[in-house]
């Protein structure tokens, strides 16, 4: 079966939001729980939904913590977000070659749109599925299934690209092929343990991989 659809995670995959996310967590946690959290303590919070993360910290303050996080994140977004090498050119080429491309993210739509506009990627994506559009987040298959449905694509014709185990396992649960990115903050070995079909060292590695898959 040939691949005609590529789904991407956003944070840490298409755009480098790591410093923004870490700073947003540290600001929020220092505000409510001074001197209790260091940088290394918040690294595991990258990937899960804000609700899941803050529920484990303080069940009684979840919405308050999310509001604080999102306010800081919004205010400092453009100064702390960077593009990854070859992302723009690769997505542009995928569109030129006729691939359907979508984003599946656990972020809220407003922040997603800010990131896509800043990186000038907003012109390319046919479908963007955010946490606002689903009941369940990755690794549950629902977000990927929704994106595939909106794109008119089948799982066996799709590839999911991401920087976290939620993306790889989410793709596996939905029945797509999977590609992990080696620039993940979690480290290459961490993602290799989840057995993605492919490992990308830069986003442009996608192009020869897809070409090979569609030739065989």
Swiss-Prot record:
For this protein, what is any one GO molecular function term?
magnesium ion binding
Q: Which cofactor does it need?
A: Mg(2+)
State the source organism's domain of life.
Bacteria
Q: What is its EC number?
A: 3.6.1.1
Q: Name the active site residues.
A: 9
Reaction(s) catalysed by this chain's protein: diphosphate + H2O = 2 phosphate + H(+)
Q: What is this protein called?
A: Pyrophosphatase PpaX
Recorded hits in Pfam families, A to Z, give:
HAD_2 (PF13419)
């Amino acid at each position: 079966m040939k691949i005609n659809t590529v789904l991407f995670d956003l944070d840490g995959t298409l755009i480098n939001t790591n410093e923004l996310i870490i700073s947003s967590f540290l600001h929020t946690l220092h505000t409510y729980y001074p001197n209790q959290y260091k940088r290394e303590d918040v690294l595991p919070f990258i990937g899960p939904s804000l609700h899941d993360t803050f529920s484990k910290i303080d069940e009684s303050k979840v919405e308050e913590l999310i509001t604080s996080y999102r306010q800081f994140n919004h205010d400092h977004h453009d100064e702390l977000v960077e593009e990854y090498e070859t992302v723009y050119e690769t997505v542009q080429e995928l569109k030129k070659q006729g691939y359907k491309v979508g984003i599946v993210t656990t972020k809220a739509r407003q922040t997603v749109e800010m990131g896509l506009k800043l990186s000038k990627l907003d012109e390319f994506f046919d479908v963007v599925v955010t946490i606002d559009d689903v009941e369940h987040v990755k690794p549950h298959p629902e977000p990927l299934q929704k994106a595939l449905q909106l794109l008119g694509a089948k799982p066996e014709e799709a590839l999911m690209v991401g920087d976290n185990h939620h993306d790889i396992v989410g793709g596996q649960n939905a029945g797509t092929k999977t590609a992990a990115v080696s620039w993940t903050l979690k480290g290459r070995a961490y993602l290799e343990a989840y057995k993605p079909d492919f490992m990308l060292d830069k986003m442009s590695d996608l192009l020869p991989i897809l070409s090979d898959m569609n030739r065989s």
